[in-house]
Regions:
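H/E-rich (His + Asp/Glu) clusters that bind or coordinate divalent metals
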Residues: 167, 172-174, 179-181, 185-189
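A structural motif
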Residues: 31, 36, 144, 183-184
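Active-site acidic/histidine proton-transfer and metal-coordination neighborhood
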Residues: 9-113
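Short, solvent-exposed loop/turn segments at secondary-structure boundaries
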Residues: 12-18, 51-54, 124-128, 160-163, ...
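Acidic/histidine-rich catalytic cores of soluble enzymes
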Residues: 3, 66-168
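A short, acidic, flexible beta-alpha connecting loop/helix-capping segment that sits on the rim
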Residues: 188-199
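Hydrophobic residues within beta-strands of alpha/beta enzymes
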Residues: 1-3, 39, 147, 187
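Short secondary-structure boundary segments
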Residues: 43, 151, 191
Length: 201
């Protein structure tokens, strides 16, 4: 099971950041007490609103996130909990290479990855999705703790998330990765409703 705590570890306000860090530590503590193996999160933005801006993709933003996540990982190690980050194109850890850098700099077995292929995509790169997915599997595969499955369609010049199997995604590489390298991994279906549940299987 995964306990989600999707807050902004790059919040520039020191007071808010302290509260956010405390919330993460509390989630890790409760995860340990409840027998939840993973606390999951995304990687934030350089503004208080947690919105996309180009600075999110800067080296400075990545350094800020790495420094701010270190005490969280240290506590996860003490509590025996996996802390898994989910790369998202709009956020600081926006691609597989940046995720790999975080893993290498932290160098902790308690820091792992939630792999959501659609979250790595944007209107600017979705046509290269097969290459992006291959890169993610190559760079991050050993450290993936969970997979999120959904799909996307293009509407009004933007990607819109939809239930798995109802959009433009090709799952062949993802399914092969799961079968060959992570046969017992947990996979969750996102954007799934009673109306599309059968189709999403």
């Amino acid at each position: 099971a995964v306990l989600g705590c999707y807050l902004n570890l790059a919040n520039p306000d020191e007071g808010q950041l302290a509260k956010i860090t405390h919330r993460y530590l509390a989630h890790i503590r409760f995860a340990s007490l409840l027998g939840v193996g993973v606390v999951g999160t995304e990687t934030g933005a350089v503004n208080e609103a947690y919105k996309f801006e180009e600075k999110n993709h800067s080296d400075e933003a990545l350094d800020i996130f790495i420094q701010n996540v270190k005490p969280v990982i240290s506590y996860a190690e003490k509590m025996g909990v996996i802390f898994a980050i989910e790369p998202v194109w709009k956020h600081i850890v926006c691609n597989p290479k940046r995720a790999r850098k975080v893993l290498d700099e932290i160098a902790s077995p308690n820091l792992q990855i939630i792999f959501d292929p659609v979250n790595l995509l944007d209107i600017s790169n979705y046509q290269n999705r097969d290459v992006i997915i291959e890169e993610a599997i190559e760079l991050l595969g050993d450290d993936i703790a969970m997979v999120h499955m959904k799909d996307f369609v293009v509407q009004d010049g933007k990607l819109v998330s939809v239930a798995a199997g109802t959009g433009e995604m090709n799952y062949e590489k993802i399914i092969r990765f799961i079968k060959e390298r992570k046969p017992y991994i947990h996979v969750t279906l996102e954007n799934t409703t009673p109306e599309n549940a059968v189709q999403s299987k």
